[in-house]
């Protein structure tokens, strides 16, 4: 079952969706990765609709509790569990307020909560700034401001109009957020045999160090 999405203020997602059920192998530039997306509500924002009904808080079933719980609580619990237990990297999708009826200010608190939580648990992530006009100077300025504030890549993009190439760029940018833990270098045997102080070997080592730091 695919996640649902629509224009307007009404929340469409009711529970996390894993797409596809089994990870798909995707080639990105010079390396491949097994990818499975987990779509979740995130934190409910002011002026959104769908988390209450005529009887008060909307009650929903979740995989984590036997009984129904309020939608807002379910959204928060689900989001936290997805971030902590079911993901290795995060893509935070927020907006400049141009995509619908909600303003930029409505998203900021929830956006900060997600970013703070990802930083606290050390999950690598990037931010997508969804906009109907991602190329305009004011959108790029907002992305730059957010990038400076959050210290992570912030990519302005129109999610509705993005291409396959855009998706590859997003995945590539996200994967580059993983820290480099080890670099293996294959040198010709005759260079490996030289002493560590040999001038030629030192040139090789210095160039390798420059390229990875």
Name each model-derived stretch.
Residues 2-123, 160:
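Switch- and interface-adjacent substructures of P-loop NTPase systems
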Residues 2-5, 111, 139, 201, ...:
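Generic structural signal for well-ordered, non-membrane alpha-helical segments
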Residues 82, 170-174, 207, 211:
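Residues that form generic nucleotide/phosphate-binding pockets
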Residues 113-126, 131-197:
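Canonical P-loop GTPase G-domain recognition
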Residues 198-213:
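Charge-patterned, long linear interaction tracts outside catalytic cores
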């Amino acid at each position: 079952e695919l996640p649902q999405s629509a224009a307007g203020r009404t929340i469409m997602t009711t529970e996390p969706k894993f797409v596809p059920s089994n990870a798909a192998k995707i080639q990105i530039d010079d390396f491949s990765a097994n990818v499975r997306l987990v779509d979740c509500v995130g934190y409910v924002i002011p002026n959104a609709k769908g988390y209450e009904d005529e009887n008060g808080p909307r009650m929903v079933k979740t995989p984590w509790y036997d009984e129904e719980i309020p939608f807002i609580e379910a959204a928060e619990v689900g989001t936290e569990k997805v971030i902590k237990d079911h993901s290795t990297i995060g893509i935070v999708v927020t907006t400049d307020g141009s995509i619908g009826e909600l303003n930029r200010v409505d998203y900021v608190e929830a956006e900060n909560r997600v970013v703070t939580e990802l930083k606290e648990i050390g999950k690598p992530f990037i931010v997508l700034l969804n906009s109907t006009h991602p190329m305009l100077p004011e959108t790029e300025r907002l992305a730059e401001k957010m990038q400076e504030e959050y210290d992570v890549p912030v990519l302005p993009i129109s999610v509705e109009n993005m291409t396959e190439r855009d998706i590859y760029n997003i995945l590539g940018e996200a994967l580059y957020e993983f820290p480099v833990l080890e670099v293996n270098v294959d040198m010709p045997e005759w260079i490996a045999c030289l002493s560590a102080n040999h001038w030629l070997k030192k040139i090789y080592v210095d160039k390798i160090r420059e390229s990875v730091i």
